Amino acid sequence: MLQVILNIRLDHKTSDVKTMESSHERMEAIVAELESSGTVMEKVPIRTCNRIEYYLSVQEIPPGFEFDGFTVEGDEDALRHILRLASGLESMIIGEDQILGQIKAARVQALREGTCGPVLDMVFTKAVHVGQTVRRKTQINRGSVSIGSAAVDLAESIHGDLKCRKVLAIGAGKMGTLVARALAEKHLSAIMVANRTYERAYQLACELGGDAIHFDRLNRALRDADVVISATGSPHYILTRERVRDAIPPERRSAVVMVDIANPRDIEESVRELGIRLFTIDDLRGVAEENRRRREAEAREAERIVEGELKLLLRSLKHMEVEPLLAEVRGNMESLRRREAERALNKIMNSSDPEGVIEALSRSIVDKIFHDIAISIRQAAERGDEEFLSMCAKLFNCKDLK
């Protein structure tokens, strides 16, 4: 490829949530360093609760460039990864749908910011298409498959049936909505939804038949909750050790389960010191493995689809590489045609032999096109360039000289 497609990433397969939190700025610094070298043509970042990724289209990778321990893949491997990612095959919860929306959003945002050009636009558009195809042709996303549903399953594995428990969901964004829907599938009667924007909390609570909580009354809701699942987009802790200590009486703390699926994390790790049972995305791996086993057959079919679509994408990208050359060749031919046509039209108006003018026109066009071709072929023969001569024979559908 004339441009190298590069994927730099850190995800749940290689890192825990704490490492991902602390590595975001390092990855951005690496991308910025690459950009400063003038080699980056396009870029699209993807950040979710369990991955940080950059897709780059670069002219070259500077010799000796260090990627500081991040996973780095190029060209075919990078393209395979984005297609697998969109299909739900790279997710912690195999088959989850949220990643497809996140890839769509990443493309739209990069287009808006002017960092996604024709190469990555083609790649991301194809990825979305493949993700949709996999979900249409397989049952990989059948049932409740999301980080949100896994968090609810984890809480249920500890507390048992949640129908007799009070559950507090913090966050009403995309991830919080997934949590809420997973709770709704359990037909729970005591669901509380808290969000900084009360209107959004109220809207989601109405859908669930639960109660919306003003954020300034979060401590009161914490006091009554048996299960807390937090999934906001806040850059800072929502539940600090001090807040939890003040909100939950000591005698209740050992019975409270908190699941933090945000990145950056919403709940300060030191709340464990209070006796609270705190779980993070890292603790969902057991749930994820069970989900993986259940979906093995569907995953194999999805992988077959991905490999077929990857071949088509590679071919399309190769076609894209030569489009400027084809456009220039066609432009040169068109300029020649116009010049010769104009000359012929001027002659034909004053000629008693229009057929002769047309004959001369066609011969002139052929001679001018053939002139440069003939020079190149003769020069190749002089230097013994058999590969070039063979290529010309194929290009003009002629017999090889051999």
From Swiss-Prot:
Q: Which cysteines are joined by disulfide bonds?
A: none
Q: Catalytic activity annotated for this protein?
A: (S)-4-amino-5-oxopentanoate + tRNA(Glu) + NADP(+) = L-glutamyl-tRNA(Glu) + NADPH + H(+)
Which GO terms label this protein's molecular function in UniProt? glutamyl-tRNA reductase activity; NADP binding
Cross-referenced CDD domains: NAD_bind_Glutamyl_tRNA_reduct
Site entry (Important for activity), positions = 81
Q: Which UniProt keywords apply?
A: NADP, Oxidoreductase, Porphyrin biosynthesis
Entry EC no(s): 1.2.1.70
What InterPro entries does the record tag this protein with? 4pyrrol_synth_GluRdtase, 4pyrrol_synth_GluRdtase_dimer, 4pyrrol_synth_GluRdtase_N, GluRdtase_CS, GluRdtase_dimer_dom_sf, GluRdtase_N_sf, NAD(P)-bd_dom_sf, Shikm_DH/Glu-tRNA_Rdtase
Pfam families, from UniProt? GlutR_dimer, GlutR_N, Shikimate_DH
Q: Where does substrate bind?
A: 48-51, 91, 96-98, 102
UniProt binding sites for NADP(+): 171-176
- Write out the GO biological process terms: protoporphyrinogen IX biosynthetic process from glutamate
For this protein, the record's Gene3D superfamilies field holds: Glutamyl-tRNA reductase, N-terminal domain, NAD(P)-binding Rossmann-like Domain
Q: In which pathway does it act?
A: Porphyrin-containing compound metabolism; protoporphyrin-IX biosynthesis; 5-aminolevulinate from L-glutamyl-tRNA(Glu): step 1/2
So where's the catalytic machinery, residue-wise?
49 (nucleophile)
Q: What does this protein do?
A: Catalyzes the NADPH-dependent reduction of glutamyl-tRNA(Glu) to glutamate 1-semialdehyde (GSA).
The family annotation for this protein states:
Belongs to the glutamyl-tRNA reductase family.
Q: What else is known?
A: During catalysis, the active site Cys acts as a nucleophile attacking the alpha-carbonyl group of tRNA-bound glutamate with the formation of a thioester intermediate between enzyme and glutamate, and the concomitant release of tRNA(Glu). The thioester intermediate is finally reduced by direct hydride transfer from NADPH, to form the product GSA.
What is the UniProt domain comment for this protein?
Possesses an unusual extended V-shaped dimeric structure with each monomer consisting of three distinct domains arranged along a curved 'spinal' alpha-helix. The N-terminal catalytic domain specifically recognizes the glutamate moiety of the substrate. The second domain is the NADPH-binding domain, and the third C-terminal domain is responsible for dimerization.
Q: How does it assemble?
A: Homodimer.
Name this protein carries in UniProt: Glutamyl-tRNA reductase
Q: Which organism is it from?
A: Methanothermobacter thermautotrophicus (strain ATCC 29096 / DSM 1053 / JCM 10044 / NBRC 100330 / Delta H)
